[in-house]
A protein has these predicted regions:
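Hydrophobic, aromatic-rich cap/lid helix
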Residues: 99-132
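Gly/Ala-rich beta-loop-alpha elbow adjacent to hydrolase catalytic centers
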Residues: 15-19, 23
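Short beta-strand/loop motif that positions the catalytic acidic residue
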Residues: 139, 145-147
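Acidic catalytic loop of the alpha/beta-hydrolase fold
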Residues: 149-154
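Conserved acidic catalytic loop of the alpha/beta-hydrolase fold
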Residues: 1-11
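Catalytic active-site module of serine/aspartate enzymes centered on a nucleophile-bearing elbow/loop
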Residues: 166-194
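Short beta-strand immediately N-terminal to the catalytic nucleophile in serine-hydrolase-like folds
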Residues: 13-15, 40
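Flexible "cap/lid" loop of the alpha/beta hydrolase fold
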Residues: 28, 35-70
């Protein structure tokens, strides 16, 4: 409907993390409207991981009179830079490949979480229950599966690329600086133009 409203017949689709699952479904259901597909950091979980993530990763949160939701949102964002998954706070799950961003950056992400506080969990739950192993082989459009070297979901790249016919894969550099972001943009542009 969005594409129809904007009078866009077809276009390239990009989806990152949860959005990668959404973009893959658009490509499956409307291949005539998707020129090429880019999946950035698609999560590919085992059944055991899915169950654990559904139970712990994205709890339903509501504002309360003491503002505990504000502290929760800060910790939810901050802890993702320290652990993966963020709810497993052990040395085994510590993310050594990333450094803690400045508080101003964390604050921007927290504000985004707060905008969708009462519904944010629905997108995560949809991604965690997505039947990706069954659905991804149905993608017929040319697809690039990628992730940044510091992305905790990068293990999904190989798994997704194996399932999707007509796919290529690659890894982007660390996105924490402008050079890394520029390289990522160039890699995606080259795929889309190729």
């Amino acid at each position: 409907r969005v594409m129809d409203s904007l009078e866009i017949e077809s276009c390239h689709f990009f989806g990152s993390h949860t959005g990668a699952h959404i973009a893959s479904e658009v490509a499956i259901k409307h291949p005539d409207r998707v020129k090429k597909l880019v999946l950035d950091g698609i999560a590919m979980f085992s059944d055991e991981e899915r169950k654990e993530y559904l139970e712990h990763y994205a709890p339903e949160i509501k504002p309360d009179e003491f503002g505990q939701h504000l502290v929760w949102a800060w910790n939810f964002v901050r802890d993702q830079f320290i652990y993966f998954p963020y709810f497993k706070k052990t040395s085994e799950h510590q993310r050594d490949e990333v450094s803690m961003p400045p508080p101003e950056f964390i604050n921007k992400l927290v504000l985004e979480v707060l905008k969708g506080l009462t519904t944010y969990h629905k997108g995560y739950h949809a991604a965690f229950t997505h039947k990706d192993k069954e659905r991804l082989p149905m993608i017929t459009v040319e697809t690039f599966c990628g992730a940044s070297e510091d992305d905790p979901l990068k293990s999904g790249v190989d798994k997704a690329a194996e399932l999707i016919p007509n796919s290529t894969k690659g890894f982007f550099p660390n996105e924490s600086n402008e050079e890394g972001l520029g390289t990522k943009a160039s890699m995606i542009r080259d795929f889309l133009k190729g």
